[in-house]
């Protein structure tokens, strides 16, 4: 069995790199196999290096999506829709286009469903859903291992703004409702809690914990962009309780 060159020097285009692989043909049955070329090996090595350069900005695991948050995420989802009680993993990475590689790794690791994948100018985000927590966490672990990161290496959240405003006026309520088309409407006289975080994805954890803690209405949840923004409304006492739960959730991540 003798190796025969798969590409002669004279056949190569000007300026193209030399391919050093060879095709080995068997004289007995005519079968052949292709030996990996040096150029292919360098490509594989370069791809592995690129994956390891991906920066983990946000890693948010929600054990059980609350009804309002699940419904809200469904209104903005372009993929599979979540249902209340599903587990959810939200990840944000940098650079933005790296989210395609992260998504590919996560989906091939388990039976999770892809709800959202957003490519921004600087960052990329994705949302994974499944009814079993272990399935979602497994995909997350595989991604972390692939990019050489850990949960503790994610960017710590910081709170840019937090406030409770009591007894919203009619004019204010109308403008809020016209700006936010995906969530519920706020009514005049309600109290409102607003929260702004960086990175953006952490507002999902705040929203989920706030809904668990009190009888409030989710008005708006923006988990993409430079900052995450959460708006809740309800009775003053309920809003204050939900606000405390939301801030506590952010602080727990910061102190992890």
Curated annotation (Swiss-Prot):
- Its Gene Ontology molecular function terms? structural constituent of carboxysome shell
Question: What GO terms in the biological process aspect are recorded for it?
Answer: carbon fixation; photosynthesis
**Region named Disordered:** 1-24
Q: Which UniProt keywords apply?
A: Bacterial microcompartment, Carbon dioxide fixation, Carboxysome, Photosynthesis, Repeat
Localization (cell) = Carboxysome
Q: Which GO terms describe its cellular component?
A: carboxysome
CDD domains linked: BMC_like_1_repeat1, BMC_like_1_repeat2
Matching entries from InterPro entries are given as:
BMC_CP, BMC_dom, CcmK-like_sf
What are the BMC circularly permuted domain coordinates in residue numbering?
55-157, 158-256
Q: Where is this motif: Gates the pore?
A: 120-121
SMART domains according to UniProt: BMC
Q: What is known of its domains?
A: Contains 2 BMC domains, trimerizes in a staggered manner to give a hexamer; each subunit in one trimer interacts with 2 subunits in the facing trimer. In each stacked hexamer one trimer forms a pore of about 14 Angstroms in diameter; open-closed and open-open trimers are seen in crystals. Glu-120 forms a salt bridge with Arg-121 of the adjacent subunit to close the pore. Dimerization of the trimers forms a channel-like compartment (volume 13,610 Angstroms(3)), accessible via an open pore. This channel may be large enough to accomodate transport of substrates into and out of the carboxysome.
Family under the similarity heading: Belongs to the EutL/PduB family.
Subunit comment: Homotrimer. Forms a dimer of stacked trimers, the same faces interact. A CsoS1-CsoS1D-CsoS2 complex can be isolated following expression in E.coli.
Q: What does this protein do?
A: Part of the carboxysome shell, a polyhedral inclusion where RuBisCO (ribulose bisphosphate carboxylase, cbbL-cbbS) is sequestered. It may control transport of RuBisCO reactants in and out of the carboxysome. There are estimated to be 6 CsoS1D hexamers per carboxysome.
**What is this protein's record name?**
Carboxysome shell protein CsoS1D
């Amino acid at each position: 069995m003798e190796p025969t060159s798969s590409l002669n020097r004279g056949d190569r285009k000007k300026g193209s790199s030399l391919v050093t692989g060879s095709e080995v043909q068997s004289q007995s049955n005519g079968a052949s196999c292709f030996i990996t070329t040096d150029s292919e090996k360098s490509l594989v090595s370069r791809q592995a290096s690129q994956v390891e350069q991906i920066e983990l900005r946000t890693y948010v695991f929600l054990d059980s999506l609350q009804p309002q948050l699940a419904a809200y995420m469904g209104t903005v989802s372009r993929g599979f829709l979540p249902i209340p009680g599903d587990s959810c993993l939200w990840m944000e990475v940098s650079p933005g286009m790296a989210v395609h590689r992260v998504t590919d790794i996560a989906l091939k690791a388990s039976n999770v469903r892809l709800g959202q994948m957003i490519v921004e100018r600087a960052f990329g985000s994705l949302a994974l859903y499944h009814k079993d927590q272990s399935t979602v966490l497994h995909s997350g672990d595989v991604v972390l291992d692939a990019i050489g990161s850990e949960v503790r290496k994610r960017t710590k959240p910081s709170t840019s703004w937090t406030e409770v405003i009591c007894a919203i006026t009619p004019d204010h309520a109308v403008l809020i409702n016209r700006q936010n088309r995906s969530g519920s409407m706020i009514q005049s006289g309600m109290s409102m809690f607003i929260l702004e975080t960086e990175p953006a994805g952490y507002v999902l954890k705040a929203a989920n914990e706030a809904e668990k803690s009190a009888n409030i209405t989710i008005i708006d949840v923006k988990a993409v962009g430079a900052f995450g923004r959460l708006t809740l409304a309800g009775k003053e006492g309920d809003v204050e309780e939900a606000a405390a739960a939301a801030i506590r959730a952010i602080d727990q991540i910061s102190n992890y």
